[in-house]
Amino acid sequence: MSNQNIRIKLKAFDHRLIDKSALEIVETAKRTGASVRGPIPLPTKKERFTVLTSPHVNKKARDQYELRTYVRLMDVISPTDKTVDALMKLDLAAGVDVAIKLN
């Protein structure tokens, strides 16, 4: 696997959780002898919702909500077999979505 790279993309709603998970991945990869590029913070996606609080009248009474999605990107350069095994066994937090691609 010396000529392949692993691209890891993390998504979460909590920035503290995603940064902690990214740090765990970087430490695991470096401990097994691979080099890591990142974590690179990608732009935060903000979804805004406006909801009427009154069921019938009072158009001016509204609540506004925002949902932020944080994304981090990492490249593991020249991973070894130990690196792949360690990354597969790694237990990350429940609120983090992990997507892995081989380049």
Curated annotation (Swiss-Prot):
GO cellular component, one term: ribosome
GO biological process terms on file: translation
Disulfide cross-links: none
UniProt keyword annotations, A-Z: Ribonucleoprotein, Ribosomal protein
Keyword Secreted (UniProt): no
InterPro entries assigned: Ribosomal_uS10, Ribosomal_uS10_CS, Ribosomal_uS10_dom, Ribosomal_uS10_dom_sf
Alphabetized GO MF terms: structural constituent of ribosome; tRNA binding
Pfam families cross-referenced by the UniProt entry: Ribosomal_S10 (PF00338)
Subunit structure: Part of the 30S ribosomal subunit.
Family: Belongs to the universal ribosomal protein uS10 family.
HAMAP family associated with the record: Ribosomal_uS10 (MF_00508)
Known function: Involved in the binding of tRNA to the ribosomes.
Entry protein name: Small ribosomal subunit protein uS10
Source species of the chain: Ruthia magnifica subsp. Calyptogena magnifica
